[in-house]
Regions:
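Acidic donor-binding loop at a coil-to-helix junction in glycosyltransferase catalytic cores
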Residues: 182, 203-210
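Short beta-strand/loop segment that forms part of the nucleotide-sugar
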Residues: 30-40, 60-64
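Acidic helix N-cap motif at the loop->helix transition within catalytic regions
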Residues: 17, 42-50, 99
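Short, well-formed alpha-helical segments that are part of the catalytic scaffolds
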Residues: 12-25
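A conserved acidic beta->alpha catalytic loop
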Residues: 22, 37-48, 94
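Glycine-rich, basic loop-to-helix element that forms the pyrophosphate-binding segment
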Residues: 65-82, 99
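Conserved donor NDP-sugar-binding/catalytic core segment of glycosyltransferases
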Residues: 99-147
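Short aromatic/hydrophobic "clamp" motif used to bind/position activated sugar donors
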Residues: 87
Length: 270
């Protein structure tokens, strides 16, 4: 098994189904899927059971009871259930382009984690995307998006699907090479070395916090936001609040000031 793809989800079966269809047509086939389920109802379990029989890749469903936003805890549990030494992390609202897994494997390197991004779609187009659109890669084509009402902008260059342009844009982009939960990957040993995700973190920078501790441990990162492409399906974010952001930022500031590597409340506590 070359890689484990860890996908977070919470009560969003329509989006998760589209995402899993995207992983069923990847150019790289040697991977497993680990669903990190933050307390969804049985509807998600039923979907995974239905799709598992059709997929050539193994799907592992890791679930815990719903006690509010506990993404970091379920991610830590999913890491422990994974069967590969290299892990890709993404979300259940991000449909991968066919070469998504291939690109992560192509650019992986000892001593580095990979930092990707997403191409955000409005809710109207998110709902329009069909199984055929995913299998045929229509939803990654600028012509299809434009026909369906998407207004092209400078970010649309992400979908040009030209490797030379992608490499150039990866090189010149001013975007920080942070750990982004919707599209990042790294070696399991490097994640375990910092004790995984911080269980105290709620929504807002919880993924980047782990990446910052990896930097404190001497890790470097590569920018692949124009090479490993996924499209983001729109949704509400009722679990975010200014108070939560304030607490998360306080933790990150403390880590930076004190060069914290291992969290005291991480993967060894789940």
């Amino acid at each position: 098994m070359k890689v484990s793809v860890i996908i977070t989800t919470y009560n969003a079966v329509d989006w998760l189904q589209k995402v899993l269809i995207g992983y069923s047509v990847q150019t790289e086939s040697d991977f497993e899927i680990v669903i990190a389920d933050d307390g969804s109802t049985s509807e998600t379990k039923d979907l995974i059971s239905k799709l598992s029989s059709k997929f050539k890749n193994p799907i592992i469903h890791v679930w815990h009871e719903d006690h509010g936003f506990q993404k970091t805890k379920i991610l830590n549990k999913a890491i422990l259930k994974s069967n590969s030494d290299y892990l890709i992390f993404t979300d259940g609202d991000c449909i991968p382009r066919k070469d998504f897994v291939e690109m992560h494997l192509k650019y992986r390197e000892i001593g580095y984690f990979l930092s990707g991004g997403y191409f955000k779609l409005p809710l109207s187009i998110s709902k329009l995307i069909s199984e055929k659109d995913i299998i045929d890669s229509n939803c990654f084509k600028l012509s299809w998006l434009k026909i369906n009402g998407f207004k092209l902008n400078f970010k649309s260059i992400k979908l040009t699907n030209n490797r030379y342009i992608a490499q150039f844009m990866n090189w010149i982009t001013p975007t920080k090479r942070s750990w982004n939960g919707h599209n990042s990957s790294g070696w399991k040993c490097d994640i375990l070395a910092v004790n995984g995700f911080n269980n105290e973190m709620q929504y807002g920078g919880e993924d980047r916090e782990m990446g910052e501790r990896m930097f404190n441990n001497g890790m470097l990162s590569k920018q692949i936001r124009y090479s490993a492409i996924c499209i983001h399906l729109d949704h509400s974010r009722g679990y975010s609040s200014p108070e939560i952001w304030k607490n998360n930022n306080k933790i990150r500031a403390y880590n930076k000031k004190n060069s914290i590597i291992k969290t005291d409340n991480g993967i060894d506590k789940v």
